[in-house]
C-alpha cells in the first residue's frame, strides 16, 4: 500500500522538474534582442535530403539524413542528438512526421519553446508502444502538475505518424494523423497567465531518460534502464511543415509581461526562393504582418484557423486521457553528459551569462550553444524532490 501511494505521489510531482527553466535572455526579466522570425507564412523541410537542415542548428550530437529522413541516434551514454530551427514563429501550426526511437528508456521529443519559457511538447517513450505524452508550460511555471496527458497511438516506434501542434492565441490543439487528441484553451492555463503565447522555435531530439546516471525517478518515468548493448536506437523525422500566422523578420518583446499582446514584429518579406528544393518557405500577404519598416510595430494579430476550442478542462479531445495518474512514473532529464529534449526539454546551462527562473530544475543544458554540458545539479534537484516526497509518505 505504501508503494502504491508513493508511486502515485511521485507521478504527480515529477512533472515539476520537466519545464525548461533557463533562457539565454529571458524577456520577463530584462530587455532582450529580437528573435529572428520566419518571414513567411509556411516552411517545409523534406529530411530525406541533407539540404533540409539549412535552416536548422544542430545543437547536440550528429544528425545525418537517409532514406527515412533525419536520424537521431542514441548509441551510447551521453548521446542526445538535437536540432532547433534557426527561426521563431508566432502562432500557427507545426507538423512533424516522425517514427519514434525504440528502446527502453529512450525518449523521442518534439518541442516548441520560447525565450520566456513557454513550451508545448510531444514525447514518446521507446518502451511504450501504445501511447504518447503531451505537455505544456507557461513562463517556466512548474508549481502545478496537472499539465501532462497520455494519449493513444499505434506502434509509434514502428510507424510514421504525423504529430501536429495547432497553436493560436485562444487554444493549443494536439493532433495525431489529423485526429485531435487534446485541446488546451487559453483560460484553462491559469486564466491565460500560463498559456504558451510568445514566439516559439521548434526543437527535435532524442535522449536516454533511462541512462543509469539519471535519478531513479527519471529512469522510472522513462520506462526503465536503457540497454545500450541492444542499440543503437534511432528516431526518424521524415518531414516538417510549419505554418506561421504572423510572418516577420523579427519578433520583439515590448515589455516584461510575456503576453502575446506585447509582441511586436517587423516586416514580412518573400523568401520563397529558399535554400533548396527540399527546404522551402512561402510568403503570402497577411493582415497579421506589419509593413517592411525596420521599426518594430504592432499590427493586427493573425491566428491560424482551427476547430472551436473546448470550453473547459485542462485537456480535452476525443482520445485524450487523464493526467491524474499516468501509467509510468518519473521525471525527465538527460544523461549527465548529453543534451536533449523531453518533457524536460527545457534549456539550462552552467554559463553565468544566462538567466534562470525559480520555477523548477532545468532538465537539459542550453542547446543553442551547441553544448552537451553537465546537468548534474538539475537532476540532483529533481532527485531531492523525489526523496522529499518519499520521506514524507514514509513518515
UniProtKB/Swiss-Prot annotation:
Biased composition (Low complexity): 272-338, 348-364
PTM remark: The GPI-like anchor contains a phosphoceramide lipid group. The anchor position has not been determined.
GO biological process: carbohydrate metabolic process; cell wall organization
Keyword Ribonucleoprotein assigned: no
Domain GH16, first and last residues per copy: 45-230
Signal sequence annotation: 1-19
Disulfide bonds, paired cysteine numbers: 25-32
Reported effect, residue 207 to A: Abolishes both the chitinase and the transglycosylase activities
Knockout mutant characteristics: Does not affect growth rate, germination or sporulation and displays only minor sensitivity to high concentrations of Congo Red, even when all crh family members are deleted.
InterPro entries the record matches: ConA-like_dom_sf (IPR013320), GH16 (IPR000757), Glyco_hydro_16_CRH1_prd (IPR017168), Glycosyl_Hydrlase_16 (IPR050546)
Outcome of substituting residue 119 to Q: Abolishes both the chitinase and the transglycosylase activities
Enzyme Commission number(s) of this protein: 3.2.1.14, 2.4.-.-
Reaction it catalyzes: Random endo-hydrolysis of N-acetyl-beta-D-glucosaminide (1->4)-beta-linkages in chitin and chitodextrins
Chief location category: membrane
Gene Ontology MF terms: hydrolase activity, hydrolyzing O-glycosyl compounds; IgE binding
Known outcome of mutating residue 145 to A: Maintains 24% activity using L5-SR as acceptor, whereas it has only 8% activity when CH5-SR acted as acceptor
Residues the record marks as active site: 119, 123
Keywords (A to Z) from UniProt: Allergen, Cell membrane, Cell wall, Cell wall biogenesis/degradation, Disulfide bond, Glycoprotein, Glycosidase, Glycosyltransferase, GPI-anchor, Hydrolase, Lipoprotein, Membrane, Secreted, Signal, Transferase
Function according to Swiss-Prot or TrEMBL: Dual chitinase/transglycosylase that plays a role in cell wall architecture. Chitinase and transglycosylase activities are coupled. Required for the polysaccharide cross-linking at the septa and the cell wall. More specifically, transfers chitin to 1,6-beta-glucan in the cell wall. Chr5 shows acceptor substrate promiscuity and is also able to cross-link chitin to chitin.
Similarity section: Belongs to the glycosyl hydrolase 16 family. CRH1 subfamily.
Name the record gives this protein: Crh-like protein 5
Amino acid at each position: 500500500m505504501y508503494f502504491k501511494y508513493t508511486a502515485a505521489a511521485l507521478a504527480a510531482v515529477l512533472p515539476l522538474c520537466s519545464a525548461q527553466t533557463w533562457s539565454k535572455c529571458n524577456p520577463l526579466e530584462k530587455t532582450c534582442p529580437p528573435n529572428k522570425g520566419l518571414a513567411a507564412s509556411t516552411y517545409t523541410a523534406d529530411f530525406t535530403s541533407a539540404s533540409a537542415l539549412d535552416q536548422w542548428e544542430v545543437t547536440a550530437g550528429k544528425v545525418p539524413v537517409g532514406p527515412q529522413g533525419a536520424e537521431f541516434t542514441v548509441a551510447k551514454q551521453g548521446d542526445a542528438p538535437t536540432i532547433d530551427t534557426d527561426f521563431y514563429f508566432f502562432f500557427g501550426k507545426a507538423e512533424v512526421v516522425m517514427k519514434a526511437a525504440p528502446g527502453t528508456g529512450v525518449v523521442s521529443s518534439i518541442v516548441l519553446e520560447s525565450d520566456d519559457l513557454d513550451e508545448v511538447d510531444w514525447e514518446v517513450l521507446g518502451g511504450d508502444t501504445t501511447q504518447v505524452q503531451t505537455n505544456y508550460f507557461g513562463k517556466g511555471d512548474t508549481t502545478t502538475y496537472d499539465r501532462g496527458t497520455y494519449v493513444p497511438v499505434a506502434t509509434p516506434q514502428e510507424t510514421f505518424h504525423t504529430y501536429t501542434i495547432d497553436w493560436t492565441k485562444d487554444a493549443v490543439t494536439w493532433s495525431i494523423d489529423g485526429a485531435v487528441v487534446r485541446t488546451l484553451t487559453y483560460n484553462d492555463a491559469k486564466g491565460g497567465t500560463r498559456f504558451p503565447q510568445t514566439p516559439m522555435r521548434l526543437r527535435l531530439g532524442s535522449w536516454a531518460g533511462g541512462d543509469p546516471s539519471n535519478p531513479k525517478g527519471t529512469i522510472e518515468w522513462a520506462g526503465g534502464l536503457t540497454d545500450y548493448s541492444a542499440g543503437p536506437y534511432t528516431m526518424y523525422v521524415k518531414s516538417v511543415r510549419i505554418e506561421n500566422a504572423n510572418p516577420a523578420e523579427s519578433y520583439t518583446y515590448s515589455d516584461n509581461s510575456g503576453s502575446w499582446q506585447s509582441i511586436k514584429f517587423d516586416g514580412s518579406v518573400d523568401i520563397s526562393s529558399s535554400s533548396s528544393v527540399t527546404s522551402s518557405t512561402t510568403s503570402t500577404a497577411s493582415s497579421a504582418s506589419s509593413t517592411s519598416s525596420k521599426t518594430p510595430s504592432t499590427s493586427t494579430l493573425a491566428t491560424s484557423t482551427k476547430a472551436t476550442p473546448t470550453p473547459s478542462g485542462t485537456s480535452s479531445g476525443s482520445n485524450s486521457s487523464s493526467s491524474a495518474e499516468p501509467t509510468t512514473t518519473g521525471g525527465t532529464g538527460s544523461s549527465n553528459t548529453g543534451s536533449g529534449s523531453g518533457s524536460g526539454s527545457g534549456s539550462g546551462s552552467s554559463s553565468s551569462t544566462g538567466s534562470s527562473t525559480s520555477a523548477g530544475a532545468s532538465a537539459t543544458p542550453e542547446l543553442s550553444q551547441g553544448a552537451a554540458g553537465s546537468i548534474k545539479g538539475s537532476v540532483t534537484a529533481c532527485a531531492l524532490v523525489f526523496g522529499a516526497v518519499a520521506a514524507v509518505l514514509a513518515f
